[in-house]
UniProtKB/Swiss-Prot annotation:
Domain of life according to the entry: Bacteria
GO biological process: regulation of nitrogen utilization
The organism's taxonomic lineage, starting at the top: Bacteria, Pseudomonadati, Aquificota, Aquificia, Aquificales
Location of O-UMP-tyrosine modifications: 51
Disulfide bonds: none
Gene from which the chain derives: glnB
Protein name in the entry: Nitrogen regulatory protein P-II
Presence of keyword Transcription regulation: yes
SUPFAM superfamilies: GlnB-like
């Protein structure tokens, strides 16, 4: 099993969620996050004063899937989240040792 963490632009969340549901992903965790990468931040002017905004708002989607579903999920996220502009985000793929469904005690892929 693998955990896929995708950091994407917030306005792409609904499109990515719908695409993941369409390919059979039954659950995900979504967190509002802030960060910066190569694009760094940007400058804004508020009431005549210039401010540097270092951390940009992003959304983190976390999904745990079977090994055989990883590429399909990654391709779906890339296809739907990509704008072609700086700041589109990143995807991380992390090994998952076990999953336990708290309600039933099920373990492994049955608990996904």
């Amino acid at each position: 099993m693998k955990k896929i963490e995708a950091i994407i632009k917030p306005f792409k969340l609904d499109e990515v969620k719908d695409a993941l549901v369409e390919i059979g992903i039954g659950g995900m965790t979504v967190t509002e996050v802030k960060g910066f990468g190569q694009q760094k931040g940007h400058t804004e002017i508020y009431r005549g004063t210039e401010y540097v905004i270092d951390f940009l708002p992003k959304v983190k989607i976390e999904v745990v899937v079977r090994d055989e579903d990883v590429e399909k999920v990654v391709e779906t996220i890339v296809k739907t989240a990509q704008t072609g502009r700086v700041g589109d985000g990143k995807i991380f793929i992390i090994p998952v040792e076990d999953v336990i469904r708290i309600r039933t005690g099920e373990r492994g892929e049955q608990a996904i």
